[in-house]
């Protein structure tokens, strides 16, 4: 009898290690820092960075909440809310995210907020749904930390556009290889001391030689795309003229990848998605002369949408507006229902809900 009681107690202890399913609400609530929860969140961040057409990569900062729903016939879906922070790596930069630095608060940091559904099936995580938005830290908070730190400037500001153009012209003048075109202006700030414009922008190589270019409009992007990322500064001299400094990092060329065509599509038919909507094509600089183009992930495709003209950063909502991804088309559709207003089930000891999770960097 004692042996039976001992076995019974051991069984109860083992069962306490698993997260109970709420028999009324129909979901589990693991801790936000649970390993599987974190893996689901990291899978979502990876998905976000792979589908961003412009701007900078984001990294996980905090998991705010999580519910795990069963999914028929197999698997389970993590319904997670996460906070992200912008890094200093551009989306075209092949540097692994783990090696990318988080942009600090004194540099006018940008935070993202995402609601995501991630399917876990056979030990693999795949993203079903992503809805995000992002915003820079408030000017007041930046000023509290650093009164003299520059704030983000509108990317279509005439001084910003001029700074990007002269910085790129300076780079091309110093370059003995390909002529580079502007892909996008990614970030800009007005620096008070010394009075200057700081600008960051992405570029792409063309089939022209930099030293021989007469008409840049006749230059075409290379079939095997080569991108670069530049940082420039333009200081207006008191007696006229400018001091221009620029440094560019060029990335390895990207091989041509055949794009799958829809059934029945003609070989020469134009794509429904403009080249400017995807990362492997040059887009015009965001200036007052032409409305910038963004994109929304809609299932297996990327759909072009207009961007706000006076934006200072690339808002995640312009890509992740809450459209289910292609993975959700397989198997039974998953719909998160409204959470019933019920008490917690009578689980011995009561479940411990450790949410929100730890902050990996800082809150803004």
Curated annotation (Swiss-Prot):
SUPFAM superfamilies (alphabetical): Cystatin/monellin
Disulfide-bond pairs as recorded: 32-355, 89-100, 114-132, 146-149, 208-219, 230-248
GO cellular component, one term: blood microparticle
Subcellular location: Secreted
Residues annotated as glycosylated: 99, 156, 176, 301, 339
Keywords, sorted A to Z: Disulfide bond, Glycoprotein, Phosphoprotein, Repeat, Secreted, Signal
Major location (coarse): secreted
A GO molecular function held by the record: cysteine-type endopeptidase inhibitor activity
Record-level GO BP terms: acute-phase response; negative regulation of bone mineralization; positive regulation of phagocytosis; regulation of inflammatory response
Domain Cystatin fetuin-A-type: 27-133, 144-256
Modified residues (Phosphothreonine): 319
Post-translational modification: Phosphorylated by FAM20C in the extracellular medium.
Positions carrying Phosphoserine: 134-135, 138, 321, 325, 328, 330
UniProt-listed Gene3D superfamilies: 3.10.450.10
InterPro entries from the UniProt entry: Cystatin_dom, Cystatin_Fetuin_A, Cystatin_sf, Kininogen_Fetuin_HRG, Prot_inh_fetuin_CS
Keyword Magnesium: no
Signal peptide from the UniProt entry: 1-15
PANTHER family: ALPHA-2-HS-GLYCOPROTEIN (PTHR13814:SF6), FETUIN (PTHR13814)
Family label: Belongs to the fetuin family.
Name of the featured protein: Alpha-2-HS-glycoprotein
Natural source organism: Ovis aries (Sheep)
């Amino acid at each position: 009898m004692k042996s039976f009681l001992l076995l019974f107690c051991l069984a109860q202890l083992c069962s306490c290690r698993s997260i109970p399913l709420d028999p009324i609400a129909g979901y589990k609530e693991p801790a936000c820092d649970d390993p599987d929860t974190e893996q689901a969140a990291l899978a979502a961040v990876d998905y976000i960075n792979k589908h961003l057409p412009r701007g900078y990569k984001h990294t996980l900062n905090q998991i705010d909440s999580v519910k795990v729903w069963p999914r028929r016939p197999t698997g389970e879906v993590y319904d997670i809310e996460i906070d992200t922070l912008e890094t200093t790596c551009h989306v075209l930069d092949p540097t692994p995210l783990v090696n990318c630095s988080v942009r600090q608060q004194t540099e006018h940091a940008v935070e993202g907020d995402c609601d995501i559904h991630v399917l876990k099936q056979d030990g693999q995580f795949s993203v079903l749904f992503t809805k995000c938005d992002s915003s820079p830290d408030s000017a007041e908070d930046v000023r509290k930390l650093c009164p003299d730190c520059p704030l983000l400037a509108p990317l279509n500001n005439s001084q910003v556009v001029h700074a990007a153009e002269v910085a790129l012209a300076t780079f091309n003048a110093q370059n003995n290889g390909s002529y580079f075109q502007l892909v996008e202006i990614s970030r800009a700030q007005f620096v008070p001391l010394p009075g200057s414009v700081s600008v960051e922008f992405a570029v792409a190589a063309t089939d022209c030689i930099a030293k021989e270019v007469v008409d840049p409009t006749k230059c075409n992007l290379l079939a095997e795309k080569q991108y670069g990322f530049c940082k420039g500064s333009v200081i207006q001299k008191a007696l006229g003229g400018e001091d221009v400094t620029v440094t560019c990092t060029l990335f390895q060329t990207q091989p041509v990848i055949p794009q799958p065509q829809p059934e029945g599509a003609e070989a020469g038919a134009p794509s429904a998605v403009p080249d400017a909507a995807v990362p492997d094509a040059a887009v015009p600089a965001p200036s007052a002369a032409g409305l910038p183009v963004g994109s929304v992930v809609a299932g297996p495709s990327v759909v072009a949408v207009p961007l706000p003209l006076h934006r200072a950063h690339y808002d995640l909502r312009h890509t992740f507006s809450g459209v289910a991804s292609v993975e959700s088309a397989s198997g039974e559709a998953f719909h998160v229902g409204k959470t019933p207003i019920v008490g917690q089930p009578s689980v011995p000891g009561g479940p411990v809900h450790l949410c929100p999770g730890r902050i990996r960097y800082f809150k803004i």
